[in-house]
Amino acid sequence: MASLSLSSAHFSSTSSSSRSSISTSSLSPSSTSLPLLQSPIRRRYRSLRRRLSFSVIPRRTSRSFSTSNSQIRCSINEPLKVMISGAPASGKGTQCELIVHKFGLVHISTGDLLRAEVSSGTDIGKRAKEFMNSGSLVPDEIVIAMVAGRLSREDAKEHGWLLDGFPRSFAQAQSLDKLNVKPDIFILLDVPDEILIDRCVGRRLDPVTGKIYHIKNYPPESDEIKARLVTRPDDTEEKVKARLQIYKQNSEAIISAYSDVMVKIDANRPKEVVFEETQTLLSQIQLKRMIKTDKASPVQDKWRGIPTRLNNIPHSRDIRAYFYEDVLQATIRSIKDGNTRLRVDINIPELNPEMDVYRIGTLMELVQALALSFADDGKRVKVCVQGSMGEGALAGMPLQLAGTRKILEYMDWGDDETLGTFVKLGAIGGKEVDEEDDMFILVAPQNAVGNCIIDDLQAMTTAAGKRPVVLINPRLKDLPASSGIMQTMGREQRLEYALTFDNCYVFRLLYYLGTQYPIMGALRMSYPYRYELYKRVNEENGKEKYVLLATYAERPTPEQIDDAFSGKSRDQSKKASGIWGFLSSVFS
């Protein structure tokens, strides 16, 4: 088997940051935004979606697109169902926060549920309040009813759930089982008793700010704060030991109920290390489920995560619409998480300038879909296209960008003055940043022989500050200067700057090395999820499907991709010889 290529000269040009229904509201609209104009913009965006046969694809749902000659389907994972348990001071709260942020699960805590029901004055809340006022424990039947009600809500069904510290007894576990509430995994955070006691006894409360400190692990910032710290009543050694004893009795009782899905994690480590193990476990569950679904489902025209027939040019509206929406949702999620320097790398044939089927209109359609979506949310979006570059005989516009500004100007943005109000066109540079701009979409910024776009790009991001800047298919590798030699001065700094943009979306087709046909597979990443490696498999009657081979927390190297396709382990790959070993070394 020949080695595989990513059909791109800059496979390693960027790294991605560590990675749920998301709104673009995390972008702060400028004070001069005109909300009254959102209605016509919304109509225009919906019109574009209808024209492209857009279908919003929520996470973990199924949606079908129909074309005249085929049916394309996308099947996404079922949501995760997670239970987590841990003794007081085991770090359970921190891990819950990290899990929710990473996987978008609905966090369910019985304490929060009780307070919410009581505060809302519901029938269950009133019954619970009677027991709480009398100093009695709330009966299991009331707590179970609250938990079951919360799990039945649409957000928990769609996004999955994380049940925090519940059930606490075997009887509660049995009650949940009767209601068919079963977790995919039961995580037990394990910390030695002496460490737990030290964590609790060493805690101190600042009565002024309510902030919690630890005399050894997290000391106060000043002597003034230190002087006013107090020990919480429950953090005495005697009470901590009593709480631990109760926890042990309860946990031992429920371990048998979830022994088949229980995983014990050493939580006496830094929170980042603990979460890395937790994240791996949850990702493995997702991967196994995806593979199981692939095997159990009829293949026919089905695809998972990526469409088939990508060698058919021009791409159908359904295929284009899928990728536009896939890119959009990943970008929205990344911006919501506070990322401001983003890049999208997508090289389907119509968006790959190295192929003779490259279509500038498809790139412009993608940019328009992104711009209208954010404008629909009331944001002022500036779409930027670099101008003519180079010197003397080398002056001109990169082929990939030829005519893009005019195309954008002549595109149908609607009759509501969207273009010029919520969406404006500009060039790349610090002077192009206006105070009213909320975000910037840069169309394929790239270096040219004799000139480097990175200086202008850096000036623009500096002027933009914390406002999001999204690069669509950038090509930032160094090229020769007008004299024909590489621009060595400042090259290291330019490359470092290029790496400050994190991928929010990656889609790259895989070919045999040195070819662009046939497609052997694909690499996909949609923020904040893992990189997914697919292999294209031919089927009867000229059909095809994509089989998920592996997932990666970070962007896989060409060697890792070769190994996955050949079925080699890393130890075996080190012994590779012949043509395979030679091509692997070429990638190094």
Swiss-Prot record:
One Pfam family this sequence matches: ADK
Binding-site residues for ATP, renumbered to this chain: A89, S90, G91, K92, G93, T94, R203
GO-annotated cellular components: chloroplast; chloroplast envelope; chloroplast thylakoid; chloroplast thylakoid membrane; plastid
Disordered as annotated region, ranges: 1-34
Range of the transit peptide: 1-73
The keyword Kinase belongs to this UniProt entry's keyword annotation: yes
Alphabetical UniProt keywords: ATP-binding, Chloroplast, Kinase, Nucleotide-binding, Plastid, Transferase, Transit peptide
Catalytic activity: AMP + ATP = 2 ADP
Disruption phenotype: No visible phenotype under normal growth conditions.
Region of interest (LID), residue spans: 202-235
Subcellular locations according to the entry: Plastid, Chloroplast
Functional summary from the UniProt entry: Catalyzes the reversible transfer of the terminal phosphate group between ATP and AMP.
Description of how the protein assembles with itself and partners: Monomer.
Name of the protein in question: Adenylate kinase 5, chloroplastic
Taxonomic classification: Eukaryota, Viridiplantae, Streptophyta, Embryophyta, Tracheophyta
